[in-house]
Amino acid sequence: MAMKKLLIASLLFSSATVYGADGFVVKDIHFEGLQRVAVGAALLSMPVRPGDTVNDDDISNTIRALFATGNFEDVRVLRDGDTLLVQVKERPTIASITFSGNKSVKDDMLKQNLEASGVRVGESLDRTTLSDIEKGLEDFYYSVGKYSASVKAVVTPLPRNRVDLKLVFQEGVSAKIQQINIVGNHAFTTDELISTFQLRDEVPWWNVVGDRKYQKQKLAGDLETLRSYYLDRGYARFNIDSTQVSLTPDKKGIYITINITEGDQYKLSGVEVSGNLAGHSAEIESLTKIQPGDLYSGSKVTKMEDGIKKLLGRYGYAYPRVQTQPEINDADKTVKLHVNVDAGNRFYVRKIRFEGNDTSKDSVLRREMRQMEGAWLGSDLVDQGKERLNRLGYFETVDTDTQRVPGSPDQVDVVYKVKERNTGSFNFGVGYGTESGVSFQVGVQQDNWLGTGYSVGINGTKNDYQTYSEFSVTNPYFTVDGVSLGGRIFYNDFKADDADLSSYTNKSYGVDGTLGFPVNEYNTLRAGLGYVHNDLSNMQPQVAMWRYLDSIGQSASTSSDNNGFAADDFTFNYGWTYNRLDRGYFPTEGSRVNLNGKVTIPGSDNEFYKLTLDTASYFPIDDDHKWVVLGRTRWGYGDGLGGKEMPFYENFYAGGSSTVRGFQSNNIGPKAVYYGGNDEDNCASRDPKQVCSSDDAVGGNAMAVASLEFITPTPFISDKYANSVRTSFFWDAGTVWDTNWENTAQMRAAGVPDYSDPGNIRMSAGIALQWMSPLGPLVFSYAQPFKKYDGDKSEQFQFNIGKTW
């Protein structure tokens, strides 16, 4: 065998004396050590081919090219006569990747990071990349305050040049902040400044935001908060000179020192606007008006810039540039703002597209749009479309993206990206409710029927005191102008005595239809007609019931429990809704007002009217809308007409999971007062002329309920389910009263409360959990009443299935 000559042994060294400057002609190329990589693939990566004349530079380039493929750990090129012999050692193939000891970082996140670095099962292993990954992960742990953390990549060889890769984590504990010092502050105390930070050296029990665990990212945010605090108060020359973070020897404690220069306070002297204002100079200048002498404020400058961009966006200028340059006059301590505006090009909308609506038809989404194709782009119109899609309640999330059309200087496409949620359910089963006992339920409810936007429901309930069935359907776009049409038919067999109400049974059925007329983006008026037949029996007349029967000319016996009558009523139904909530379910911002009313029309056996008003307002207290304050009210009032009273079975009730939690359902308010009484009533005798109090709730013709809730992130729930679960702490208050109640001497002598007094307010406080389950919204609450009256029944734990209010 001819002696083999070593040409080059590494990337960084080549021998220029082996072949001389002229080199030699390659007749053939042979490989040694190839296993997974095909010969053809290796040859294609080389710059040398048989027949080429090669020299030292060509050999160096060949080695570099083979290394660049990422398939080889070692490459050597030798000459055997006129043949190039390429000896390679392939990198091992990754057979599996596992993790151990990682608690702060999830496996999925680690896999994504590894894949982004080219480390995945089936690929070759680059040990250099592993070292970078180890260091990068350790740097991550250091950034969140875990300075004792270590990450080690363990490679286990397997047959056929394969390896198992295991990343072993030792996370350690988070270093806690021992002290935060601010040096150079004179205008504000250190405690006052630190109170605006997320990082704290002391965290009171009530502070749910502060944290003693050091994180580099949070420190950067706190430094920006500190800068904004000063800039918003006129300190235009404020500067953070340096920041020192010191670690204790045991790596468990952190000391932070922030050195600052406050400077003096500066006032605004004026604003000068220049640039391409696109013909909207008057509107832009109105946004930049200031009161001379006002303190300089960085946040006001940012707000002004955002206002200008938003204004131009409404006129089709999708990408305006607004830059503010402060001119600081140190002599008189003033700042003049120079605002330069470049409106840029004006854009048309070529197309509006929807992504993610696998169930909902495009037409259902498109009819909610206020931005039109072929028209100037209006950022406010695009945002209105997003708001309207959110309020439908069909989607978990709605995002918008304005994309420039390639090759066009003045066209964009608007893309709405939605994530659909389950808007329907089918259920059949047996359950137990704290307010209804054993319950049998069957139903189909679909708020977006076959993706058409129709709401269709077939529901039935059977429990201890009620048998109910209903079919309903609503077309939200009965006309192209957005007039809605809805209707329902129902049957209800209700035994009030079994529901802890006064004694009567009501079998009713009816039908109604309603048209909804949109007034503008946020207001809708409703009008409709209804018919209901009520067949009452097993009535044991109590005072309020007796009063009603007398007003309609019906007679009843105090000695009989089998009084009864039937009534047919036709009603004109009306309503108004104002809705500016940010989404249809689990809102976090905005308000909703809902007014409903009905009044009987000629041909009815009864003559009365009834009104209810519901309000809800959400106030987010953080930018992510995870912490929200919710205020709710419910008001109700009804009365008779033409000398008649409103039917007792139309009364308002309070208590239970939808009104005042912690009290038994419908238990708040007036109680039945019977003539003569029965064995369960508080009577000294069975004298028919005597009135006897009881614990049977009868409701009233007036109601007021209020609630204040603090919505918080739900512990132990991942971000994936954050939009499906809601936790809140609440305070509820409410009362029901009877404006027609006569507080006579006989009633007072019998110890009966004055049920016409609206001041008998009940209160409770507790915690609630809501879950958007496949069966519908499930609401669990635990409440403790802290203001109640004789006869009230408590029920601390409650749950129900139904719509959130």
Swiss-Prot record:
It is found in: Cell outer membrane. Its main location: membrane. The chain crosses the membrane at residues 425-433, 436-446, 455-462, 466-475, 484-495, 505-506, 523-535, 564-577, 591-600, 609-619, 629-639, 701-710, 725-737, 763-772, 774-784, 799-803. The keyword Translocase does not apply. Residues 434-435, 463-465, 496-504, 536-563, 601-608, 640-700, 738-762, 785-798 are extracellular. Residues 21-424, 447-454, 476-483, 507-522, 578-590, 620-628, 711-724, 773 are periplasmic. PROSITE patterns: POTRA. Residues 1-20 form the signal peptide. One of its GO terms (cellular component) is Bam protein complex. Residues 24-91, 92-172, 175-263, 266-344, 347-421 form the POTRA domain. Pfam families: Omp85 (PF01103), POTRA (PF07244). Keywords: Cell outer membrane, Membrane, Repeat, Signal, Transmembrane, Transmembrane beta strand. InterPro entries: Bac_surfAg_D15, BamA/TamA_POTRA, D15-like, OM_assembly_BamA, POTRA. One of its GO terms (biological process) is Gram-negative-bacterium-type cell outer membrane assembly. Belongs to the BamA family. Part of the Bam complex, which is composed of the outer membrane protein BamA, and four lipoproteins BamB, BamC, BamD and BamE. Part of the outer membrane protein assembly complex, which is involved in assembly and insertion of beta-barrel proteins into the outer membrane. Constitutes, with BamD, the core component of the assembly machinery. This is Outer membrane protein assembly factor BamA. It comes from Enterobacter cloacae subsp. cloacae (strain ATCC 13047 / DSM 30054 / NBRC 13535 / NCTC 10005 / WDCM 00083 / NCDC 279-56).
